[in-house]
Every structure is written in structure tokens, then in C-alpha cells.
């Protein structure tokens, strides 16, 4: 429990430990569900609550201590040092560290600064969350955060009811994503419309609730895209390509999607060093990607996998311009709908990772 801090406002934030195991399905919960459904519902609730608490800490704690995000939001060394700089780095990082122990404080204080250079795969979850929230704010403000004079909210610091409304907005958005899927949730919320003053023009609990909902939706979407961007592959010869071990669980999910559309993706192929031509795998894409033999797969097959990754990214973004998503499989199945469904699962995987 952390109490804040100056500006005539009082805020209580409880940061809960991780420990959410397993992957939850992307489907609506139903009344009277089985105990396992209830457990999944509780897990989703815990993840949404934990992430909304963290996003509240990142958004408001620096400004309530007098620095605002402006001290940090000014260039990616200082820009993610923005959620880093005055907000999460240096002194506040130490303050959070002593308040919250070895968990969030050290992760926020040191993680954002040091981990950025090592790339997103090397980041701890709080550092990744900081990066995603910064990106969501950049999108919302049109890249103008470094021009925000006096902090994101100006001289008027948000009140405790406004901050609580923001937290609830984030929680509601993330709960909807985790429960119903991003693809089903995106069309149900109206994005926040800002005037020329940006966030400095926000006033009242309703506006801050919508801010939380907008940023929660954006962070959820970006969490899924980041999971796909982080997929790593390697090859040990011109004909042997592999998905890296830590990404094979997700590759299996994508392979199952590819197996639904053999007319689009065909079958994986492999080629031994002394062969002149490749041969078709007798196993599914899901198995070829997640449990490869020593020969791996050909570059052409890996390119097909990356094509599928790109389709799922487009589905997560809601990119209707990707004509591949309009394809129909044998029997009339919609590639776009199935890509959105696997995208929903990957978004949930990303959010779960952020809460760990």
C-alpha cells in the first residue's frame, strides 16, 4: 500500500504480487460457470487490477510529488526516462523501492533506464509496461509529450476522485480485453477526444475514466503486438531455420492458425544439407514450429510463418487494408476472423506477462 503525496490530494495504491499461472481463454464468462471458469475469471480480474494499479502509479505518482511527467517525457532516453526521468527514475525509483520493497520500485526505477538499451525481450515486466504506456500516450497526444509545459496535467493536479476514476477506466478496459478478447472489445468504447490543451484540459471523474479506458485499450493492443514483435528466429545453415526456444509456445499457437488454411500456407518443408531440393513435412505447422527436428525448416517455410505473424498483427491493429485478411478457406472459414481470435489470445499472453 502506497499513500501519495503532495498537491493537496491523497491516493492509495495497492500493488499486488504476480503469480498468475496458466493461460486463460479469450471468451466471455457466463453466469453459473464451472469452478474452472470461475478460477479463470478471478485470474483475469487479478491481472486487470494489478496492471491498472501499476498504470496509475506510472501516470500520476511523479506529478503528485511535484515533478509531473514533464520531467521525464522528453526524448526516449529522457522520454522513457520520461516515464523514467522525474516520474520513475532516480529519486522516485528509490522512494518506490523503499515503499514497495524489491518489487515495483526497483523495477520502475532501474528497469526503465537500464533495460531500454538491451531491447524489449530483456526488459522486466514493469519496464515493458512503462514503454507501452509511454507509446500509448504518444499516440494519444500526437507525439507532443515533450512540449507539455508544466507536466501532462499542467498546474492543476488531478484530484483523488479523478485518479480513482482513471484507475477504474483502465481496469474496466483490461478486464473486457481479458474476458471477451480485444477484437470484441475495441468497437465498444469511444476513444478520448482531446482539445488543444491535451490532458491539461481534462476535468472531472468522467473524463479521467475515459482517459483510463483509452490508455488501457491501447496498452492491451500494444502488449499483443509486442509479443509478436519479440518472436526470435535463427538458422544454423542456409537450409535450417528455427524459432527460438522461448518463443515456441507462441509459435505453436500461430502454427495452429496456419494449419487451418493449407490453401494459403501449404505445408512446412525441410532440407538436409546434402539434399538438392526440400521435402514436405508430414507434421503440422504447429508441431514443426514448436518441436522442430534437427533439420528445422527451410527459409521459405520460415517466411510463411512470418507472413502469418504479419496477418495476426494486422488483425490486432484492426488493419482492414490487409487484403490477406479477406481470404476465405475451404468451407468458407474467414482468415480474418481466425487471425483476430489468435490475436486475442496473444494479447492476453502479453498482458499476463506484464503482470508477472
Curated annotation (Swiss-Prot):
BP-aspect Gene Ontology terms: symbiont-mediated perturbation of host programmed cell death
Source taxon at top rank: Bacteria
Region feature Disordered, mapped onto this chain: 22-42, 280-300
Presence of the UniProt keyword Secreted in the record: yes
Chain ranges passing through the membrane: none
Function: Elicits the hypersensitive response (HR) in the plant upon infection. Harpin elicits HR in non-hosts and is also required for pathogenicity in host plants.
Name this protein carries in UniProt: Harpin HrpN
Organism: Pectobacterium carotovorum subsp. carotovorum
This protein's encoding gene: hrpN
Amino acid at each position: 500500500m502506497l499513500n501519495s503525496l503532495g498537491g493537496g490530494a491523497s491516493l492509495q495504491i495497492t500493488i499486488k504480487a504476480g503469480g498468475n499461472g496458466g493461460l486463460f481463454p479469450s471468451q466471455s464468462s457466463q453466469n453459473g460457470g464451472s469452478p474452472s471458469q470461475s478460477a479463470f475469471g478471478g485470474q483475469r480480474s487479478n491481472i486487470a487490477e494489478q496492471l491498472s494499479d501499476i498504470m496509475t502509479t506510472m501516470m500520476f505518482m511523479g506529478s503528485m510529488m511535484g515533478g509531473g511527467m514533464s520531467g521525464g517525457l522528453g526524448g526516449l532516453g529522457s522520454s522513457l526516462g520520461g516515464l523514467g526521468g522525474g516520474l520513475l527514475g532516480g529519486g522516485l525509483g528509490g522512494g518506490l523501492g523503499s515503499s514497495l520493497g524489491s518489487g515495483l520500485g526497483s523495477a520502475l526505477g532501474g528497469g526503465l533506464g537500464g533495460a531500454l538499451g538491451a531491447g524489449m525481450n530483456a526488459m522486466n515486466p514493469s519496464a515493458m509496461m512503462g514503454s507501452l504506456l509511454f507509446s500509448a500516450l504518444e499516440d494519444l497526444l500526437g507525439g507532443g509529450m515533450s512540449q507539455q509545459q508544466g507536466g501532462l496535467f499542467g498546474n492543476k493536479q488531478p484530484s483523488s476522485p479523478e485518479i480513482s476514476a482513471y484507475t477504474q477506466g483502465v481496469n474496466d478496459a483490461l478486464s473486457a480485453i481479458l474476458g471477451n478478447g480485444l477484437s470484441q472489445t475495441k468497437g465498444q468504447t469511444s476513444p478520448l477526444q482531446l482539445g488543444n490543451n491535451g490532458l491539461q484540459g481534462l476535468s472531472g471523474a468522467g473524463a479521467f475514466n475515459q482517459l483510463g479506458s483509452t490508455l488501457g485499450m491501447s496498452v492491451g493492443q500494444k502488449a499483443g503486438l509486442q509479443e509478436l514483435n519479440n518472436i526470435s528466429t535463427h538458422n544454423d545453415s542456409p537450409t535450417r531455420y528455427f524459432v527460438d526456444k522461448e518463443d515456441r509456445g507462441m509459435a505453436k499457437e500461430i502454427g495452429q492458425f496456419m494449419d487451418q488454411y493449407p490453401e494459403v500456407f501449404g505445408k512446412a518443408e525441410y532440407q538436409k544439407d546434402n539434399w538438392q531440393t526440400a521435402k514436405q513435412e508430414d507434421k503440422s505447422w504447429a508441431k514443426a514450429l514448436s518441436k522442430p527436428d534437427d533439420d528445422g525448416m527451410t527459409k521459405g517455410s520460415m517466411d510463411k510463418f512470418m507472413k502469418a505473424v504479419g496477418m495476426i498483427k494486422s488483425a490486432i491493429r484492426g488493419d482492414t487494408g490487409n487484403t490477406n485478411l479477406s481470404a476465405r478457406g475451404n468451407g468458407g472459414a474467414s482468415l480474418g476472423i481466425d487471425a483476430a481470435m489468435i490475436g486475442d489470445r496473444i494479447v492476453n499472453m502479453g498482458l499476463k506477462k506484464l503482470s508477472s
